[in-house]
């Protein structure tokens, strides 16, 4: 190898050769590397990932389950995370310094997580403190950046997932009189309402105008919701439900709580990704279901439960575009880079951010 070759930087974009490889060859190479590395390698996959990636997963789950997998895994030196950026950050923060977390495609982000940056959040906290004093505790959905998790950790708050949101919101109200919930207003609103908090006791913080939007009395506000949302679940509407009720009156409708309040109220069931999966699995044969969540998962449930009639609540839905960034070529590239000792797309969260964020994560993990 020449000196020039030695100093060339490691590639940061998928090399062209992976575009020309056959699916069979790529699958064969992934299996070879997995067999060779054994327990030194762990590939966790989120439920929204493509089947071409999920087939190689060592663990598949929702955000809570994958956080627990990362926290428990002490054997794997390399964790190749098939999800989006905030999930890989969480895995890095919950694993040891000796473990390496890799995201196959760094473009796999999350629009919801990007709706709350740390500067906006700190500014909002200062403004809200002038209104409410020391009566607030922050909770962040795990679909947030490491910096936002760290902010919550520093301020006595915690993280939540859609699986444990009720438990964590209930806990938060044992700590303070008011709750600031970010970045997903819909999960926060749906959870708070389920716990008996009225809509006029909730306000929305708009980070674009630095203003608090509310209809009731300011002193009665118990929940401040960040004005963020999931770009996928935002596409399920009450019109979808009304249309389905007319065309399929016997269809059960189940949605994720990232859908808006009106959609959740008009549905028959609402719950986390795990809740949706479990409900469909336990449903009687020949039952009929319209599901309001990400399309890769819906398609997987359709394939797995051929004895049931399953459709998407929105007939024009597409998969989560950022989740779909992770594909077989990127997975193989990540694995071959490990094999060569030239890891690409390593996720490393700042140590102080990690220290603060882990406070928030552990407050959640201790209660589930």
UniProtKB/Swiss-Prot annotation:
Q: Which reaction does it catalyse?
A: iminosuccinate + dihydroxyacetone phosphate = quinolinate + phosphate + 2 H2O + H(+)
Co-factor(s): [4Fe-4S] cluster
- List localization entries: Cytoplasm
- Positions bound to iminosuccinate: 46, 63, 141-143, 162, 256-258, 273
**Pfam families this protein is in?**
NadA
Q: What pathway, per the record?
A: Cofactor biosynthesis; NAD(+) biosynthesis; quinolinate from iminoaspartate: step 1/1
Source organism superkingdom? Bacteria
What does the record note about the cofactor?
Answer: Binds 1 [4Fe-4S] cluster per subunit.
Give the EC number: 2.5.1.72
Positions of [4Fe-4S] cluster binding? 110, 230, 320
The UniProt similarity line reads: Belongs to the quinolinate synthase family. Type 3 subfamily.
What exactly does this protein do? Catalyzes the condensation of iminoaspartate with dihydroxyacetone phosphate to form quinolinate.
In Swiss-Prot or TrEMBL terms, this protein is called Quinolinate synthase
From which source organism is this entry?
A: Bacillus cytotoxicus (strain DSM 22905 / CIP 110041 / 391-98 / NVH 391-98)
Taxonomic lineage from the root: Bacteria, Bacillati, Bacillota, Bacilli, Bacillales
